[in-house]
Structures are given as C-alpha cells and as structure tokens.
C-alpha cells in the first residue's frame, strides 16, 4: 500500500476451525490498515495430504473494500466469483483516514 498498491491479492488455505474464528476479521483488518481492496482466493473442501490423511479447508474466498465492507463471499463451493471494484474508492478511503501517513519504524527516532 505504501508503494501505491490499490489491490492486495491473497492466496489462502485456512482450516475450518481457524477460518470460522478469524477469517473475515483478519481480512477486513488488512483492508482497514492498508485502505486497499483485499481479494482472497481460498481453498475449499477436503484434500488428500501427506501420508493419506485428509485435510479440510475453510473456503470463503472474499472481496473486501478499502472501507472493510465484504463485497463478495464465495462460500464453501468451488467456483468463480466476480466483483466490480472502483480504485477511486481507495483514494477516497485514504483521504478520509490517512493511516499510512502516520506509520513510523520502531526504534530510535
């Protein structure tokens, strides 16, 4: 976001337990912090992992606006989700709350 990105693309494979508890909250927080659109492709379903043990994933690919509104939630079924975005929304959000301009490194000033 500091380098000028308007969209963050995030691949993911959360488990059903951690996904249900944290998924949407974490992604909405990333949108708030960066004032970017956050577009997340998430694995869904059951997958064969090492040693033949099944691994389940949460799904719920999301599109989140720079103001943290969930624009689309793909649920747990496989498929494609389309969403219209306007990158002007990024500029508007960053003007309303210019959080990135106050970011400072830790340590000696």
What are these regions (language model features)?
Residues 1-81:
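CN hydrolase (nitrilase-like) catalytic-core segments centered on the catalytic cysteine
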Residues 2, 91-109:
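Cysteine/selenocysteine-centered motifs that mediate thiol-based redox chemistry or coordinate metal-sulfur cofactors
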Residues 20, 83-84, 103-106:
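A short, polar/proline- and glycine-enriched secondary-structure boundary/capping micro-motif
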Residues 21, 25, 88-91, 100:
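Generic alpha-helical secondary structure signal
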Residues 78-95:
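A short, polar/charged loop-to-alpha-helix boundary motif
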């Amino acid at each position: 976001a500091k380098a000028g990105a308007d969209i963050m693309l995030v691949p993911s494979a959360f488990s059903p337990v951690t996904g249900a508890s944290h998924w949407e909250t974490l992604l909405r927080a990333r949108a708030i912090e960066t004032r970017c659109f956050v577009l997340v492709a998430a694995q869904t379903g059951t997958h064969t992992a090492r040693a033949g043990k099944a691994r389940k994933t949460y799904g719920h690919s999301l599109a989140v606006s720079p103001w943290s509104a969930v624009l689309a939630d793909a649920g747990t079924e496989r498929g494609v989700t389309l969403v219209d975005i306007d990158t002007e929304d990024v500029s508007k959000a960053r003007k309303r709350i210019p959080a990135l301009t106050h970011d400072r490194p830790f340590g000696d000033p």
